[in-house]
């Protein structure tokens, strides 16, 4: 079974491309990372930074998560991210996404030993 840390890697990490100017990026990646299997995941963010840099966020600025938990952390610096949002015409199983390139601070929830990101909370 996939651990929470592994799920975070699958759903949110893309170290291979620093920036993809490809408007088709989300359509391809959401399928490739199994986020369109039983439904279209409505919103998802990919982070284009090294695994080490993203794991390091767990020791940066402690903030409160959207759900009220206190194990969220905001990155000190901005990161290259891609936002994938389902389009109005998207209908399972033909999930369709709009791709947006952004440079923002990320907020992740961390847990475990080693203390690693397990949930992508927001970008600011």
From Swiss-Prot:
| Enzyme Commission identifier(s) | 4.6.1.18
Name the catalytic site residues.
Answer: 12 (proton acceptor), 119 (proton donor)
The glycosylation sites are 34
Q: Which GO terms describe its cellular component?
A: extracellular region
Chief site of localization = secreted
Q: Where is this region: Disordered?
A: 1-21
Task: List locations, semicolon-separated.
Answer: Secreted
GO BP term (any one):
defense response to Gram-positive bacterium
- The name under which this protein is listed is Ribonuclease pancreatic
Taxonomic placement: Eukaryota, Metazoa, Chordata, Craniata, Vertebrata
